[in-house]
Amino acid sequence: MKKKLCILLTLLMIPTMSNSTTKINLENYINSLLWEKRIVLFISKAKYVHFINETDDFFKNNSCENEARNLKYIRIVGDEINKYVMPDRYINKYGMWLIGYDGQDKSHSTDISLLKEIYNIIDKMPVRKREITEQNKICN
């Protein structure tokens, strides 16, 4: 009887174990990029197709400018949010955040307005001013 019970419990646990996935801790991921990358964190519901496309196009079409500024694009759209353990500051919030080398939010918008100002915001940062003088990268 005990043997049958053990087998039954084992069989019941296998599907549960195979469906479990490890979530990405967003705070830890952001912290792993400290002092290496500036981050644009983009969180959107899937229904905001225009917002998603505009943001994706910005990063695709401006790769040189983004690379020159050490920008890392973290894109979380729709159900992808379930893959993450979200820090309190982003729970139930949507939009776009510019996160500095220090891991702090530098700017936020709930539309594409941040993309229009992002280079100006970054280029005014003290560390970026130093980077500009040291960089040889020229983008067209």
Regions found by a protein language model. Name each.
Residues 2-5, 16-140:
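Non-catalytic interaction/Regulatory regions outside core domains
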Residues 11-12:
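Repetitive helical segments and hydrophobic/amphipathic motifs
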